[in-house]
């Protein structure tokens, strides 16, 4: 079983933390909507393409395939902006991303794609996260022990 982290599921914790991190580092609003919808430029959209969950020993292991889309200020010019933002986003996603004092993630296998006609780019990669295992089989025993100690 996975502990909730700050009251959030592991998926909410990782994706929410990454959105907060990107907003802080880019000074842009990270939109949470379908790319086909009308978007206000410039902006970033974080898209989680795939989430897989399995066990690493007894510990829950999550893998996230993420796409970070950047839409330039203008549809009519902005190649230089795209190249600069690609470099900036790659740098932001490099190294450890601290979500809390004790939990960090890394984005691996980062690559970029440019959509020149749309004046947009995509930086994509994967996040692997392993969470602590909590053995619930001892939880009732510990609760009973705690009650007995308080009464005793």
For the regions a protein language model found, what residue spans apply to each?
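Charged, amphipathic alpha-helical segments and their flanking helix caps
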Residues: 1-31, 50-152
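Short acidic low-complexity segments
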Residues: 31-40
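A short, hydrophobic beta-strand-centered structural micro-motif
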Residues: 40-49
């Amino acid at each position: 079983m996975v502990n909730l982290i700050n009251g959030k599921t592991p998926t909410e914790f990782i994706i929410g933390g990454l959105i907060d991190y990107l907003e802080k580092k880019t000074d842009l609003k990270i939109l949470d909507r379908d790319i086909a919808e009308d978007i206000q430029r410039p902006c970033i959209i974080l898209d989680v393409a795939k989430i897989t969950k399995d066990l690493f020993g007894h510990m829950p292991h999550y893998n996230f395939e993420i796409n970070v889309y950047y839409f330039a200020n203008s549809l009519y010019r902005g190649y230089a902006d795209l190249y600069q933002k690609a470099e900036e986003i790659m740098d932001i996603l490099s190294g450890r991303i601290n979500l809390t004092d004790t939990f960090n993630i890394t984005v691996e296998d980062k690559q970029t794609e440019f959509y020149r006609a749309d004046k947009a780019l995509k930086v994509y990669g994967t996040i692997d996260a392993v969470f602590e295992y909590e053995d619930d089989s001892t939880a009732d025993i510990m609760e009973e022990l705690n009650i007995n100690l308080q009464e005793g």
